[in-house]
Amino acid sequence: MTYVGAAEALRFPALEKVTGSMEITTSFVNGMYPTMLEEIYTPVLKRVGKLVMTSRANDETQYNTTITDLDCFSALERVDVIDIHKQGGLVSFKGLEKAIGSLDDEMSWLVGGNAYNPTFEEAKAGKLVKP
């Protein structure tokens, strides 16, 4: 499942499972200005193989700054890989707390280029919000 586009919101009210990769591009540069995804709604999503959030931006000034937390994934219980990059406003991973418990090792935690980038050890220890 891949989303690359310019919608303000992605809403999947009945989606419970993605067996493969769920890839969400949160900002898309069309011409000179980026369009940013503002909302992700997945209230019953319990399982994802690989969760990817990234941006098609070329530089930090075009990273998504509207998504500040991942509370949209608070129902997520199991994920094999979390890969989140280029989220300039992201300061809280608290919504992934249950899913982080299912991760096996630091190779399953790929995080960087965000406003907050907890290490695998910090995430497992519950340090999910930027101090």
Question: Residue spans of the language-model regions?
Answer:
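Concave beta-strand-loop units of leucine-rich repeat
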Residues: 1-131
